[in-house]
Amino acid sequence: MLTFMASDSEEEVCDERTSLMSAESPTPRSCQEGRQGPEDGENTAQWRSQENEEDGEEDPDRYICSGVPGRPPGLEEELTLKYGAKHVIMLFVPVTLCMIVVVATIKSVRFYTEKNGQLIYTPFTEDTPSVGQRLLNSVLNTLIMISVIVAMTIFLVVLYKYRCYKFIHGWLIMSSLMLLFLFTYIYLGEVLKTYNVAMDYPTLLLTVWNFGAVGMVCIHWKGPLVLQQAYLIMISALMALVFIKYLPEWSAWVILGAISVYDLVAVLCPKGPLRMLVETAQERNEPIFPALIYSSAMVWTVGMAKLDPSSQGALQLPYDPEMEEDSYDSFGEPSYPEVFEPPLTGYPGEELEEEEERGVKLGLGDFIFYSVLVGKAAATGSGDWNTTLACFVAILIGLCLTLLLLAVFKKALPALPISITFGLIFYFSTDNLVRPFMDTLASHQLYI
């Protein structure tokens, strides 16, 4: 699931701060009228609105009063997209790093390519000579795996709906403990064994303890954003390596296709579990748990719903009649005034931080399944580098298209369908067409 966090409106109301101009330039007529009484201000705003509608012209002073001097709405939208491009690039880096960690481990550590067991969620074996039986077993494994994922997602949404925050935090903490301590211990032991590096157990345990303790603090409490992002990338890579090792080959490809379809349904359907989770978080003005989401930037809590200021002690921007005609977004839904946290110190007239730090949020599940696809391409079959690089490029192309759609629709979108579809197409076409062609050229010593 991919979400773009940006305020619905960057315009400010006409007050002492936003209408400050140099003493040499005269104050615009609309700003002077804006300082009149409430009734006069409403009548003036209505008269100006009707006049603009009849003449079909825009008053440039209006943008000065709204905190956007001489900037038309089209330019504002253009600047918004340019500003978000930085965070789009910032999202490519962690996805690339996660896939690089997985591919490097698959190519060097033999432990994750040895098939000596299966997950409990995939009980049907694929060690059968019959193609039909193997395909049937892979479909049955996929049905069981997707059913478990759906059940766990619905269970999480129900817990969040009924505010069982302590249970959810305990659940996430136990998962993080297992990944940061147990899986890290196994991973580090296999890496040291592969590269023939000797290390005594006290040093190994101390290293794992320091790594896991710092990760728990950064993810579930406080820590530098870069360090938190690094731990989330490492957690995703460790989970992807577990799936690569214990998922049967055919079942893995069928599961990747099925999980992309489920992601599409869960995010876009009105009663989809992931969509309900995001909408509930927006209604309550609460951030989604950081252990489930990767954020490309630090995002401060800004109200996204119409809340009662007296109930939470928040400061709401005053109502401006001039913004009545702009109070609906492109989809016909009302854009409510944003609610900001009051300052810790100072007076009511002190400046507030009204600019929200924008960022793109990507679920850790997307990191995991991207890495599973690339890791399986590197581990199964021929393990050709052309196939691995083709899957890598396909995932980035799909992610880029998803981010483009995100900038257009400005709502939560599934991040798996396009990338996984491109990845599967590139994998099978490269493995069955490009690789044999390259092998034939190499055998005849022909170079293009």
From Swiss-Prot:
GO CC terms in record: endoplasmic reticulum membrane; gamma-secretase complex; Golgi membrane
Protein name stated in the entry: Presenilin-2
Intramembrane feature ranges: 414-434
Entry's EC annotation: 3.4.23.-
Biased composition (Polar residues): 19-30
Modified residues (Phosphoserine): S22, S25, S30
Subcellular location: Endoplasmic reticulum membrane; Golgi apparatus membrane
UniProt PTM comment: Phosphorylated on serine residues.
Keywords in alphabetical order: Endoplasmic reticulum, Golgi apparatus, Hydrolase, Membrane, Notch signaling pathway, Phosphoprotein, Protease, Transmembrane, Transmembrane helix
Active site: D263, D366
